[in-house]
Amino acid sequence: NSNEGTAKVFVVNLLDCSVMYTFGDNDEFSLRGSLSFFDGSALVDAETDTLIYPGENGILYLIRLNTKYDLNSGTLSIDPGRTVKWRYYGTRSSTESFWLGMEDSAAIYKGYIFMTDNGGNLMCLDLNTLQLVWVQDTLDDSNSTPVLEIEKGHLYLYVSTSFRLGWRSYDTATVPVWKIDAETGEIVWHTDYECTTDDGVSGGVQSTIACGKNSLADYIYVTVAKTSDNASGVLACLRKSDGSKAWEDSSSYAWSSPVCVYNKDGSGKVLYCNSTGDIRLLDGKTGKQEDVLSVSEGVIEASPAVYDNYAV
């Protein structure tokens, strides 16, 4: 929020940068009052032309956009129809801790949405019936976006959580990295890290896990913040099969999500940024440091976007 108005969602026309539609501000359907922040990224289902957006106000929005694009004139329009809203309340939800609301981005597979929330819940929701299929306890304020992976024909999720000061401890707390059966919500394995934290700068995992492909197909990569003290962290390479640690890269803590990049022969490297302004490039199999580029004296919270041979 600012002098310019209340936080909300903007639907922007990328052809002319005009604002086509806004929603989400001061929504009376929210159980979190006037809070209307949207930290995650939206998804649009092309087949149904539906915008799907979980918000920190504790509402999942489903909006039929009725998009029209005229190729000849180069014009784009939307005419949003009826908005469907879903909300929830957790068994430990309160205004002091374990808040309602989603700060992660949703993952969707065949009509099912997977999302974590501030209250330590990983939820699987049927988008056609808006009924919960299962809920798994993620212990703490969870901002890590669930990552879907099909392995031998079965769907799994990789996800983690953070450590918000005072909710579970004022000292240290366990932050697991989980592999979850996406059909049942059952925990397949977890690998635990003991983390510290600061008020407002949480330890644990704030990033999205990267699933390796090609030569890195056996591994996942996750940045874990504040593992030994408030300044330190690791990029962990874990085996998908059992969660065992293949290697770790220790540096300043990172909220940045790792990105796997590949050569034409399928060999892979891992790129991530940390809290002292470094961009680190590592061999994905061994963890050997390939290069470090210092671009800032401050924290890089953003994650690299990679296209061809360039990273932004």
Please annotate each region the language model reported.
Residues 1-16, 27-29, 38-73, 80, ...:
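Active-site-adjacent structural elements in enzyme catalytic domains
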Residues 2-6, 57-59, 120-121, 163-168, ...:
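Short glycine/acidic-enriched loop and turn motifs that connect beta-strands
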Residues 3-6, 21-44, 75-107, 134-151, ...:
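Extracytoplasmic beta-rich repeat domains
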Residues 13-16, 65-68, 126-130, 181-184, ...:
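Short loop/turn segments that connect beta-strands within beta-propeller blades
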Residues 47-49, 110-111, 153-155, 217-218, ...:
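Short coil/turn segments that connect the beta-strands within blades of beta-propeller domains
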Residues 205-210, 219-236, 248-284:
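Loop/turn-rich, solvent-exposed surfaces of beta-rich toroidal or solenoidal domains
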